[in-house]
Structures are given as C-alpha cells and as structure tokens.
C-alpha cells in the first residue's frame, strides 16, 4: 500500500455552447507493476502486476450546464492470473474465492451536471481521485486496482471551502437476501485562507462504513465503523518549480453495533512534510502514532489490528514513513500519458502484540518497503 500518484492534476478543456451533442471516446488506463515487500505478523506482502483499462464514450448532453453522460467498461487484469474471485468487491488485494470467472470486467456509467462554477454532481461511478484523503484514511492503490466507486458524489470548489461528499454502494440487498447491504459514505474537505505565496488550511475528513439493512425477512446484524480526522496545514509555492506542504492531523476511530474488531474507540496522530521539485519529484516524510486505530480504507501499516494474524493486536503503532516518486509526462503526447516510479519505506518502532489467546510478544524495530512503476494513459478522441 505504497505511495502512488495515480493521476496528475490536469487542465480541463473548457466546454462551449457549440459542444452540445459532442461525442468523445476516452481510453483511460494504466499498466503497472507494484511490489510490496512486507514481512512479519502485521501485514503480508504481495505483488500486483497487470493493467486496468476503462474505454468510455462521453456524450455532452448540455454544454451550458456541463451535463455529461459517460458509459463504458472497467477491466482489471493481473499477469499470470488464470481466474478471478467472483463474489467479492475488489480492493487493494482481493480475497481468494472458490467461485471464479475468467476475467474481471464491470460496467462503468457516470452522469454529471455542473450547477455553477463551484458545484458539481456525479451519479453512478465517482471521480477516482481519492477524495483528498490522507494515507491513513485512503490507500492510493484503491484508485488503481480497486473496483470503481459507485453511488453519488457532490463536489464544491469555492474560494475558502473545498468539499467532497460521497456514498459508495458496495453490496446491494435483495428481498430475503442472506447478505447484508454494505456501503461507504464520507465527507472530505478543507477550509482555506489564501495569501499571495502561501495557503493556510484546516483539513476535515469523515468516513463511515455501514453493514446491515432493513430487510424484514432476514435478520442482519448492524455494524457501523467510523474514521475521522482534523488538523492544520500550510502550503507554499516557491516560484514555478517548488512547493512544500506541512500538515498535522489527529485521527479517530469508533465502532458501533455488532463488534467485528476488539476496539471500540481509537486515535492517531499524523504530522507530515511533503515537497515537489520541478514538477517531477515528490518527496514526503511522516510519523504515525496510534492506539486502537483501524483504517477503513487507508494504509494498513497504521492499524493496531494485524491484517494477517487473526486476533493479534498491538498496544501502539508507531511508524516513520519516507516516500519518493518521480513522474514524467511526455510532451509529444500532451496530457495523454505519464510515467510514475515510486518507493516507500516504513520503519516500525518497537511495540507489544497481544494474541487471541492472551499471550504477548515484543516487536523491535523493523523496516518494510514498497516499490512500483505505472504508465498511466488517458487519450481522448472526438468522434462527432
């Protein structure tokens, strides 16, 4: 679950009145190789070699209000995979399932409308941008190899407030279904104070995962898990080739309902320094200190619950994270393709683990690392 900038911030082509009924073909995708070298009782390592492809047609229904309809397919493939789990939603690393299918292909459909210059609504597949969530709340691998988020999304981009509110429906419930409904909802934003050379901001994040439903024919246990974070940040742009971003966030975890993990409430603290050089290099350093914290969509290195050893918990999770990535966009194919190479080092500080049977084990310093490369492409062709 390393640092992987999936898609750069790109200028958006302006929509003009004459673009009504315009039809375009988009071919968004990425071919990637990710090697997560993780060892020990906390999290297992894994390798992700493959590609994701999203061919889509876009119809500009009303250029005045920027009303668009996009439809296509989402295709994920791992090199060497003979079959794919059929009964699970795909996250960063899907679980094995005895029921399989020869490929993993999903429909992709999105309708969007822009109410004004600041407010936009998405229905269907959501914007795959990570919702501006920090690493403990969102693993960037989800934007690459996870199933598309589906539901609704509202984005507000004002001068002093930026907000993303969404619901991602993961499991639909049928009448008399033995499977409960599952969805994730969240709100992520920041209050900003702009100056000529810097920006002071207050980041606010909230994520809830719900499992249950109102099917009266079948009894479902209801469980809600919450992540939240708030903090302070300072962003400064120095010239055209350098910026730095300093922030500190406090995190909160809470579980309500049928217990699925041994923690009811937990917390974490996460200071981070990030810089970008010449629009190529992104470097960051951070420190995490957490107790009884479980990341719902985030990087599992920050969890106090083991991902590979049932019932194992840690009294404290303290992690120093160093990240570096290099990006290259090719001017011969502007705004259509870029290469990313990255590496992440996680240094664990000593902690004590407690197993399900009550026995304890002391863990010393340990290093884990992840490296990867991705060639991201998103050409567009105007059909008529």
Where are these regions (language model features)?
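Exposed, low-structure sequence patches enriched in small/polar residues
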Residues: 28-30, 50, 108, 160-166, ...
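Secondary-structure transition into beta-strands, especially the periplasmic turns and strand N-termini
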Residues: 65-67, 119, 161, 281
């Amino acid at each position: 679950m390393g640092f992987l900038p999936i898609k750069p911030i790109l200028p958006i082509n302006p929509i003009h009145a004459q673009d009504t009924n315009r039809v375009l073909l988009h071919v968004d995708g990425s071919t990637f190789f990710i090697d997560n070298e993780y060892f020990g009782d906390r999290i297992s390592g894994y390798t992700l070699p493959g590609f994701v492809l999203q061919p889509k047609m876009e119809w500009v229904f009303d250029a005045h209000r920027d009303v668009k309809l996009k439809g296509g397919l989402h295709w994920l493939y791992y090199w060497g995979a003979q079959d794919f789990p059929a009964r699970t939603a795909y996250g960063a690393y899907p679980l094995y399932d005895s029921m399989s299918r020869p490929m993993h292909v999903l429909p992709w459909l999105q309708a969007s409308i822009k109410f004004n210059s600041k407010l936009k609504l998405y229905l269907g597949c959501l914007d795959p941008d990570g919702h501006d969530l920090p690493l403990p709340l969102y693993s960037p691998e989800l934007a690459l190899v996870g199933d598309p988020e589906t539901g609704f999304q509202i984005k507000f981009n004002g001068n002093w407030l930026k907000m993303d509110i969404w619901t991602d429906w993961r499991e639909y419930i049928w009448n008399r279904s033995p499977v409960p409904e599952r969805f994730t909802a969240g709100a992520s934003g920041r209050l900003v104070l702009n100056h000529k050379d810097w920006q002071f901001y207050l980041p606010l994040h909230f994520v809830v995962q719900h499992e249950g439903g109102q099917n009266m024919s079948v009894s479902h246990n209801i469980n809600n898990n919450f992540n939240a974070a708030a903090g302070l940040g300072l962003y400064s742009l120095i010239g055209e080739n350098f910026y730095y971003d300093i922030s500190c966030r406090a995190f909160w975890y809470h579980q309500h309902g049928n217990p699925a993990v041994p923690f009811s409430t937990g917390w974490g603290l996460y200071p981070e320094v990030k810089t970008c050089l010449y629009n190529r290099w992104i470097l960051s350093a951070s420190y995490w200190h957490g107790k009884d914290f479980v990341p719902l969509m985030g990087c599992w290195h920050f969890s106090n619950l083991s991902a590979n050893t049932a019932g194992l918990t840690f009294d404290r999770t303290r992690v120093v994270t160093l990240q570096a990535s290099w990006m290259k966009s090719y001017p011969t194919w502007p705004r259509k393709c870029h290469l990313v190479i990255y590496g992440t080092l996680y240094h664990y500080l000593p902690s004590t683990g407690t197993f399900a049977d009550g026995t304890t084990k002391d863990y010393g310093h340990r290093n884990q690392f992840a490296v990867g490369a991705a060639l991201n492409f998103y050409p567009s062709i105007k059909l008529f």
